[in-house]
């Protein structure tokens, strides 16, 4: 009789019999099968990400991410490809419900000279994915208890940018700039306190690897009595960037030791692309602690920008500087034209300043100041032409009036 009753037990939700399912869990007069339990878990998981504006359903592919980056970032093709794959894998890991124990988080280290687009890449990724984004400067950070910013303040910035929506903040992106500036003074462990170097790396470790952090909503040091907000950093993507001046020499030294007898043949290749051959041991030699390096499995290097790349940056991206100035002039009814030799002269000046694309805006502001001061008050101007002589301060911008009159500003 007991056997007969056992055979007729059915799931109270789907009606399947005990024989049709793997497990049948009994409650007080009700039963639920393993299939219905799985379905309930899926529904709960969907509700968990409902407020994240469809990013789970519409997670872009690496190619789609790369294509969007191309609209705003010129060159750096390999870095863009590495970032696209890493970001895709990171969010796939979150939204496909994979256990964090199975797949390591794809935190990213960007290595490259000043003005090569490290910050822009991180900003553009966050914009495309529509996730909260925060930028921090590693040079302002110190260990807790010392003058400076606590590492938890980075998380506070992210939380503020997410309008204190904890769930959104927990899938955000944090970019830490100047990370090379917190390298320890030597590659051997220090017996003295290094509160802005190794100490900061140790403090960052906790939030980078994933922890339940206590965030002071008004900043940590001035309001010690406030209540804390808990933020899980497990699914926050950390991107660190730095110029790592001097890293090339460390890499060359390592490669030189390994290629004795072949050095003359490989030297040219090494010189052209040294940073791309960076290994974790090089970063450790530079002064990053092994545990910190280990938390950034993805390393992308960015190349110094040449004249052609800088000209493209001036003209091609959706938010290119030349396009911005042309839009400003068009509001006053004036067409703004930059000649090819003017663009090349601007690129040369930027290279001379050794700050990459970062120099372009200040150079343009200097060139355009006088004419932007004049045009709103001057009637009848149809076109403004900027040529090489204008860039090099040998002439004023050429103004063409509607009655075909030409005048220098």
UniProtKB/Swiss-Prot annotation:
GO terms for biological process: cell division; proteolysis involved in protein catabolic process. The keyword Zinc-finger does not apply. ATP binds at residues 113-120. GO terms for molecular function: ATP binding; ATP hydrolysis activity; ATP-dependent protein folding chaperone; protein dimerization activity; unfolded protein binding; zinc ion binding. One of its GO terms (cellular component) is HslUV protease complex. Component of the ClpX-ClpP complex. Forms a hexameric ring that, in the presence of ATP, binds to fourteen ClpP subunits assembled into a disk-like structure with a central cavity, resembling the structure of eukaryotic proteasomes. Belongs to the ClpX chaperone family. This is ATP-dependent Clp protease ATP-binding subunit ClpX. The gene is clpX.
């Amino acid at each position: 009789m007991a056997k007969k009753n056992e055979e007729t037990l059915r799931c109270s939700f789907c009606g399947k019999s005990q024989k049709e399912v793997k497990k049948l869990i009994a409650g007080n007069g009700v039963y639920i099968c393993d299939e219905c339990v799985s379905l309930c878990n899926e529904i709960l998981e969907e509700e968990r990400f409902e407020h994240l504006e469809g990013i789970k359903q519409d997670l872009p592919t690496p190619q789609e991410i790369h294509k969007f980056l191309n609209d705003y970032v010129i060159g750096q093709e390999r870095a863009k490809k590495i970032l696209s794959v890493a970001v895709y894998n990171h969010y796939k890991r979150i939204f496909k419900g994979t256990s964090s124990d199975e797949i390591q988080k794809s935190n990213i280290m960007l290595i490259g000279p000043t003005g090569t687009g490290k910050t822009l890449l991180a900003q553009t990724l966050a914009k495309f994915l529509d996730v909260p984004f925060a930028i921090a400067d590693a040079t302002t950070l110190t260990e807790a208890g010392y003058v400076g910013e606590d590492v938890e303040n980075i998380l506070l910035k992210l939380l503020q940018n997410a309008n204190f929506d904890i769930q959104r903040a927990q899938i955000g992106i944090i970019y830490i700039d100047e990370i090379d500036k917190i390298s320890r003074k030597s590659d051997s462990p220090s017996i003295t306190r290094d509160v802005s170097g190794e100490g900061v790396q140790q403090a960052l470790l906790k939030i980078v690897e994933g922890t339940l952090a206590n965030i002071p909503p008004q900043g940590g040091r001035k309001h010690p009595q406030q209540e804390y907000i808990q933020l899980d950093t497990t699914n926050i993507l950390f991107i660190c960037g730095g110029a790592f001046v001097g890293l090339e020499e460390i890499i060359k030294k390592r490669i030189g030791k390994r290629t004795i007898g072949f050095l003359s043949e490989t030297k040219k290749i090494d010189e052209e692309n040294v940073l791309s051959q960076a290994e974790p041991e090089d970063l450790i030699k530079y002064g990053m602690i092994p545990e910190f390096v280990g938390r950034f499995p993805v390393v992308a290097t960015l190349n110094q920008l040449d004249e052609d790349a800088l000209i493209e940056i001036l003209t091609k991206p959706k938010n290119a500087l030349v396009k911005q100035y042309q839009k400003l002039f068009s509001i006053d009814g004036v067409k703004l034209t930059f000649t090819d030799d003017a663009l090349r002269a601007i690129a040369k000046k930027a290279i001379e300043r050794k700050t990459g694309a970062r120099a372009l805006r200040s150079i343009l502001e200097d060139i355009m100041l006088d004419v932007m001061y004049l045009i709103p008050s001057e009637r009848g101007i149809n076109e403004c032409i900027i040529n090489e002589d204008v860039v090099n301060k040998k002439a004023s911008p050429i103004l063409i009036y509607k009655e075909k009159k030409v005048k220098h500003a």
